[in-house]
Amino acid sequence: MGKPLADYVKLPELEEYKEWFKDFADLYREDGILQVTWKTLDGPMHHSGMSHRAISQLVRVLSLDYKNEIIIFTHIGDHWMTESDPNGWETYSELPTQRFQHQYFDDTNLIKNMVFDLDVPTIGAIPGSGFHWDSAMLSDITICPEDTWMEVPHAHGGLVPGDGMGLMCQHYFGTKRGNYYMMTARQWTAQQMLDWGMVSEVLPKDQVMARAWEIARMWKTKPYENRTIMSNLAKRPLKKLLVEDLKLHTVSEQYGSLLRIAAGDMGDRNAAQQDEKYISQTNDWRYTFPHMQQAPTRESWAAFRTEPIEWFKKVEAGEAVNPCDPTRPVKPYRPDGE
């Protein structure tokens, strides 16, 4: 056999891109099964323009490494994402180019790369309550613990809920129920997610990660080619959904934000539309108290802008405990206690 004129392009190996993304994800691979644990530095992931972009970038890089045969997506600690970087949105606010790139490219890629770039089986392993659950719910199957509750929070803060979560609610819950939860910001529980088709299994909290690895190892017994083709069939309904509606949703959110900027009423918690860093102050409160699981009212919406701030003051004064405390030490899960 003769020698080809040019060889295959050398792409980065795991150890190299693991270093690239070390501030946003812990990557662990065993027997072709890759566990992606979202984080920021050594603690829980803090929502920011930078993490937004890093998620979509990492997913694209993972798709180029054929040694990643099955991928588990999870989050460090006992919750999904609950924190936000208060200084992580400065470039997001710069007009026109920076904001356009963040909202037109990053917001879309965050969703579509999970489905269109990854051709291998994926598992979303949710450790607990949180927001921006995109990568977990876009996985081929999703599992979560019994104490999980989630929501689409945008409407509370005056935003158009167009980053993809509302679209997935319509898809998984059905149009009317999805519209209701998207337009009211009411939270739903793990059992509701199971009943309505958003998750595949609900488990005791301490069994989620072990179960994710058990499923991945089960899939490994199936021929590589066949399980990969199987995964592409699993992704097809979401591919059709995203082709039809994703860009409309993301651009609608962007358009709504630009209108508020033009009107001069985007800003703090008293503005018509809250800036990202102000919305984020409410995150831990949302997953500490079950208020938002009740049918929302005008009064409860108004309280959303004041009660979390008062609660945080008590936490800072030592008069209340924050179960989502981002300063608690956490470590990524390892199978078999490694």
For each of these PLM feature ranges, what is it?
Residues 1-31, 40, 66, 76-82, ...:
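C-terminal alpha-helix plus adjacent terminal tail
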Residues 79, 107-161:
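Glycine-rich beta-to-alpha active-site loop
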Residues 131-134, 185-192:
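Acidic, divalent-metal-coordinating active-site segment for phosphoryl/phosphodiester hydrolysis
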